[in-house]
Amino acid sequence: IPGLIKLSYLLNTDKYDDLIIGCLEYEDSLYSEEYHNWADLRQEGDERYQACAWCHGFGGITASRLACLPYAGVELEQRLKQDLSRAESCFLSLQMRKGMCLCHGNLGMLLLLDKFMEYNSSSGLKYIKDLLVMATLDELEHSHIMPQEKYAKGMMNGMAGIGYACLKLAGVDSLPDIMLCDI
């Protein structure tokens, strides 16, 4: 969706609006008011709404909506903001995960939360971020990195991404925003 919205913006056309709206409607159909999350289609039953990662659940939806926002017209902007409002409750109930990777670990969610807080910050979100930062630093200091992340060198699932996240969270602003695919 971000690619289509940016393309429409750059070409100054509404040619893709129906397609964009259709994609947003499909993703919105996967949202559950009961669970305050988007479905992970790999799972069945209640498990479908437990994902909180960049790759599945509210994390990816949040990243997509934040990436779209600068290029959206007024009508689309309202739809995006509705989803971002939904995402806030997901962030407020965020809990530590076992992994640290960008794709589905703590550092990925911290980067998304940090980006989200540029859009909408609250004392509750700051509290959650502070807790996650402290817990994540403790895990990293004690080398509690899952083997599949420790021995993987990749960006989204490995040590390159963990290093990238540490730099971003330390305030290095010159790096592209990988989580929003701003490369």
Language model regions located:
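Glycan-recognition and catalytic cores of secretory/periplasmic carbohydrate-active enzymes
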Residues: I1-I183
